[in-house]
Amino acid sequence: MTLIHMNIFMAFTMSLTGFLMYRSHLMSALLCLEGMILSLFILVTLTVLNLHLTLAKMMPIILLVFAACEAAIGLALLVKISNTYGTDYVQNLNLLQC
């Protein structure tokens, strides 16, 4: 395992730890999820480039598309919860009736 891969794995682990510890606010959870997705994107891109996989060159782009969709849906939920309840607590997601 190279130093770059270890740093990316540590970034993913720190984001996962932050997601598990600070999950009471939706904004914190979304930021940690974005950190996880970005570290996965960099790891997949480096793996595809290092192994010269021609069939898997679309995988990082597909991962970015899913990350953009996740961010858009998360921000839409954040705006809806903030407008409805005035806070961004994750516990309000159970009360949201769309």
From Swiss-Prot:
Catalytic reaction annotation: a ubiquinone + NADH + 5 H(+)(in) = a ubiquinol + NAD(+) + 4 H(+)(out)
Enzyme Commission no: 7.1.1.2
Domain of life, per lineage: Eukaryota
Example GO biological process: ATP synthesis coupled electron transport
Localization per record: Mitochondrion inner membrane
Record InterPro entries: NADH_UbQ_OxRdtase_chain4L/K, NUOK/Mnh_C1-like
Signal sequence annotation: none
Membrane topology note: Multi-pass membrane protein
Family in the record: Belongs to the complex I subunit 4L family.
Protein name, as recorded: NADH-ubiquinone oxidoreductase chain 4L
Organism listed in the record: Inia geoffrensis
Lineage: Eukaryota, Metazoa, Chordata, Craniata, Vertebrata
